């Protein structure tokens, strides 16, 4: 499969199955899809199909380059991954290994974010804080179901996890104790809205948290429209100085500020750049996920503007980096030399089998987006996974089981 596009003055050709990316001149760009459709055409015939735009000699030279790339395995590469990926996903189902938990340490929140899928932290249920006992059992569940995997991920999530910070500290201590007993290693993450962030919490996070996620949407007016406090006032001025201190205290690494863009800020590149101007180097801003009926939901007609925003952002990031102003946008972190293995790229995030969410009372769901939806209740940390069909459905999902995905270059 070949995917071609023009961007920022470049002709870019992606050979999907090999992962090769080619930057070409006009004639090669025009010839590549033509030669894919007309495998046996001579160079003279190809020149004719190009309506005489190029001389036969030019076509011959370009076609030779294309044929060489094909021989090298970086163009027109066949898809040989389907059987391998199906075998990989089957193995995930038959021999499940849980690698990560999202611990809902608090089903309560001190903000009233309009787009929050957790419904003010309650997740379609009651306000609750996870007890130390449930949290310990969750960590033990992860150890017991992690197989031979050494490194395990735990995200303290909410609601707002700092509302139950004493239990967070106790669970980290318990996790460190269990590391020594089991030869496992926990990598903890704390996701926070920053309202309660103080020196004690920050010092603890810098000592124990592998990653710190700081929730802020960008410009003051954008953030405060969607992320008000319980009283209805804005949260921007409360959290910005705290987040700046947090980023600097971690030497601008192992954290990111995480925002959400909606129909009200389709010019979200301005929010990313605003955050950079405020001193943040690690930035993630993502599209809202919500009911299409919501006034802030992204519309089909927003797409051209949104796509252009990513181009604006790419150009500005390149410019700033050349000026010596480092900025890392999470969704541009694509490693062209390495990156995830092909099985992971084609089979998804691991929700429902490798990654699970745990409620304050110990129920298990495929991920935080499903918490509170009873049809996705897997079981609990005491009895384990009771509904085996849900992990099977999630685990077997991959690009090849979805007809539209199978045809898509992405």
Regions found by a protein language model. Name each.
Residues 108-118, 366-369, 403-410:
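Local cysteine-cluster metal-coordination motifs and their immediate loop/turn environment
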Residues 102-104, 153-157, 189-193, 213-217, ...:
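A cross-family glycoside hydrolase active-site/sugar-binding cleft signature
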Residues 53-54, 60-69, 77-78, 83-203, ...:
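Conserved alpha-helical substructure of the radical SAM core
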Residues 304-338, 368-409:
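C-terminal accessory region of radical SAM enzymes
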Residues 39-54:
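Short acidic, hydrophobic short linear motifs in intrinsically disordered regions
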